[in-house]
UniProtKB/Swiss-Prot annotation:
Belongs to the GTP-binding elongation factor family. EF-Tu/EF-1A subfamily. This is Elongation factor Tu. Monomer. It comes from Fructilactobacillus sanfranciscensis. Its main location: cytoplasm. GO terms for cellular component: cytosol. SUPFAM superfamilies: EF-Tu/eEF-1alpha/eIF2-gamma C-terminal domain, Translation proteins. The lineage of its organism: Bacteria, Bacillati, Bacillota, Bacilli, Lactobacillales. The gene is tuf. PANTHER family: ELONGATION FACTOR TU, MITOCHONDRIAL (PTHR43721:SF22), ELONGATION FACTOR TU-RELATED (PTHR43721).
């Protein structure tokens, strides 16, 4: 049908015009953890979008951040949109099944990373500008220990 023909032509033109983004695969693996859940009988899964690097089945990783201790584990499964994979690359949204990790040991905001590639920091210096109410910013003040 005519619509299908033009639709395919349009998408071919778009594919030619817009370059495919390059994936940052040469740097060490790192994935911010967006969600954590348990699969009964299998274990704990950390999900998120891989920021850089490649992760493969059997790779050792560290869970870093928000707690003092770094937790070491092994990736025993990788899934993307209910498809089992042998590896995940930068840009992929995956779930990584983690060996010997309890659900309570992993939280959103931590990072799954290649061993020794990420360090945590407890303090940093910053200069912050807070927009006024008139500028479209906050209407109420910040209080001590604001999170």
């Amino acid at each position: 049908d005519l619509l299908s023909e033009y639709g395919y032509d349009l998408m071919d033109t778009v594919d030619e015009y817009i370059p495919t983004p390059e994936r940052d695969e040469r740097k060490p693996f790192m994935m911010p953890i967006e969600d954590v859940f348990t699969i009964t009988g299998r274990g704990t899964v950390a999900s998120g979008r891989i920021e850089r690097g490649v992760i493969k089945l059997g790779d050792e990783v560290e869970i870093v951040g928000l707690v003092e201790d770094v937790l070491k584990t092994t990736v025993t499964g990788i899934e993307m949109f209910r498809k089992t994979l042998d590896e995940g690359q930068a840009g992929d949204n995956i779930g990584a099944l983690l060996r010997g990790v309890n659900r309570e040991q992993v939280v959103r905001g931590q990072v799954l990373a290649a061993p020794g590639s990420v360090q945590t920091h407890e303090k940093f210096s910053a200069e912050v500008y807070i927009m006024s109410k008139e500028e479209g910013g906050r209407h109420t003040p910040f209080f001590s220990n604001y999170r």
